[in-house]
Amino acid sequence: MVPRCDIILASPTATFGQPEINLGVIPGAGGTQRLTHAIGKSRAMELILTGRNFSAKEAESWGLVSRVVGEGEGEVVKEAVKVAAAIANKGRIAVQAAKEAVDAGELCLGCGHDMDVAC
């Protein structure tokens, strides 16, 4: 789910993973494609094929998490509210256009998502 988010803040104790392989299935909802796009093929293959969990620090170093914040969930929520407020104070049209421009770089992702659905 993380690769679908625009901005990701995490606590230092957060863990992430693609555990579906442990259940005999592949990540759904485009998970294989989104993770590969976000962190690269080799690293995505390792995580998807082993089902290994990874830390917030690893996720941050790979660019999957925007920032590791504070010491706990409460601090992450406070920082998320600050980020949201900063964005809300910008021009709505400019924010929407910027999001669309960034998202346009992922248009080919849909092809991979179709492959996930077919599996």
Name every feature range the model reports, one short phrase each:
Residues 1-49, 62, 79, 83:
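CoA-thioester-processing core
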Residues 9-14, 65-115:
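C-terminal long alpha-helix characteristic of the crotonase
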Residues 40, 49-50, 89, 103:
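Residues at helix-coil transition
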Residues 41, 56, 73-77:
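Residues at or immediately preceding the N-termini of alpha-helices
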Residues 51-58:
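Acidic, divalent-metal-coordinating active-site segment for phosphoryl/phosphodiester hydrolysis
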